């Protein structure tokens, strides 16, 4: 994508977090401010989180209040673990969903009563099973994912607790010991989605696709208050 964009004349600037969307007296977006420098343009097209994009505008130019966003239903966040194992694992596939506990209870903890699930369902991916280049010879690369409600407390202690929960079950369900063969482990959760993507409450997928958040009931792609401002992100 980068090569294609550059071939079409796109100038990509990295390490340039946007601090403000510039709006003129005609209520037109005419640029952005990043790293203390203004960059001018004919249109502003934001692929960032919609709520975050609006915080880059002066309050009078924002279409939706904090109460509006608070009332919306968002897709789950996730707790992810990226794990390297010092051996090839048995009884696993490239993609596996572990539904060995009550799906309904986990769903309630995401959508009805937001909290950390007592017994979470989880997903595991081992790309090195089908792409040998994704792990060294004789090793295994694994990704584990637990769906979570957005906006939950996120601490290193909670992450470790849930890693131990799912790994205990994983060992039982696949009839093997793996925890003593972990070479590398990195986690990613609510706070990281907020820090890296400015994602509202750390959600992973944007607004949920509920009946009352479908089609014209979703936030508009074109700003009603600022001309030449369009949204594509987290919708």
Regions found by a protein language model. Give the residues of each.
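Generic, well-ordered alpha-helical scaffold segments in large soluble proteins
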Residues: 4-8, 47, 56, 165, ...
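A conserved beta-strand/loop element that lines the FAD pocket in flavoprotein oxidoreductases
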Residues: 5-18
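Mid-domain catalytic core of redox enzymes
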Residues: 19-135
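Hydrophobic, well-ordered secondary-structure elements that form the walls
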Residues: 45, 83, 144, 170, ...
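C-terminal segments that line or cap access tunnels to active or ligand-binding sites in enzymes
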Residues: 86-191
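A glycine-rich dinucleotide-binding beta-alpha-beta segment and adjacent secondary-structure elements
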Residues: 123, 176-235
